[in-house]
Amino acid sequence: MKSSNIGGQAVMEGIMMRHGDVYSVAVRKPDKEIEIKVEDYKSIIKSKKILSLPVIRGVFNFIDSLVVGTKCLMYSATFFEEEEDYLRRKNLQGAEKAKEDAKKEKEDKVLMTLTVCFSVAFSVALFMVLPYLIASLLHQIGATETIVTIAEAGVRILLFLLYMFLISKMEDIQRVFMYHGAEHKCINCVEHGLPLTVENVMKSSRFHKRCGTSFLFFVIIVSIIFFIGFFAVVPVQTMWMRVAIRILLVPTIAGVSYEFIRLAGNSDNPAVAFLSKPGLALQKLTTKEPTEDMTEVAIAAVEAVFDWKEYLRENFPETEIPEEP
């Protein structure tokens, strides 16, 4: 199976899809129409050659994904703001509209920056720092640093699974996870040589090896390996230094995890497939079976940035491409 190199994420009542330097956002509006927005986004990686090196590129790809993802979430949310605000902005015209749009764009940039910074800080605190602080309580009963690090690994996995389980039970998030499933189904559909139709998408798998859920799982696993290995070789006596080192290792951990996900998405190797299974299993929590109207939104997002017919002609020449209606 050849990767299509498309990826995306679910947003509020919609899907973001990205291919190369272009991304689209398709949203099912309250009036049931599908709104599609297409924009260019030049990756940070392409600004300097060194940023495209293995591991390093993973760090900056993660930053890119956070920025684009947050921007698209904020855009999708505008369709579901208070009706009074929505109608007021919709009825603005001329200079007044331009002024309001400029003001909103500035506010959105500030909010996006704060959201990305908070998301990173929250994730590092919850999944990197807190597990160690909890496990370090074992020092009080005479546990060695090696035992504490191993216990930290168990706490980290439990916290991650608990977090995933709890958010999967939230009603609003469940709809997002249904759109997440629709996103995966679209990608699986074309990557398995099927024309991108509602019928074909609905019968495709909602699990995909390049998923962000799998990436997060590998961040957890790689962090465990790094921390156990590092502190076994380099004894660190003070707690604040041990916490600081964990934080400093996060970019490297993210970069290594990205390389594995990249490999998994482009390989049918049995060993890689086996290592991908835990991440795929976690997607049972973070993806749900979508409805047909959600699938229509996902297809619209894909078609806005990706020529799936040309992809099928090149990689699956035996596939019969449906003619334009």
Residues of each region from the PLM?
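Cytosolic juxtamembrane amphipathic/interface segments immediately preceding
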Residues: 1, 5, 10-11, 46-52, ...
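Divalent-cation
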Residues: 1-93
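Polar-ligand-bearing catalytic/cofactor-coordination segments
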Residues: 2-7, 11, 15-17, 90-91, ...
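Alpha-helical transmembrane segments of integral membrane proteins, especially early/N-terminal helices
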Residues: 17-23, 115-124, 175-177, 215
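Hydrophobic alpha-helical membrane-embedded segments
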Residues: 53-75, 79, 151-177, 250-266
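Juxtamembrane "helix exit" motif at the C-terminal ends of alpha-helical transmembrane segments
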Residues: 75, 79, 120-144, 219-245, ...
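Hydrophobic alpha-helical segments characteristic of transmembrane helices
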Residues: 86-140, 144-169
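Pore-lining and gate-forming transmembrane alpha-helices of multi-pass membrane transport proteins
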Residues: 115-120, 148, 152, 156, ...
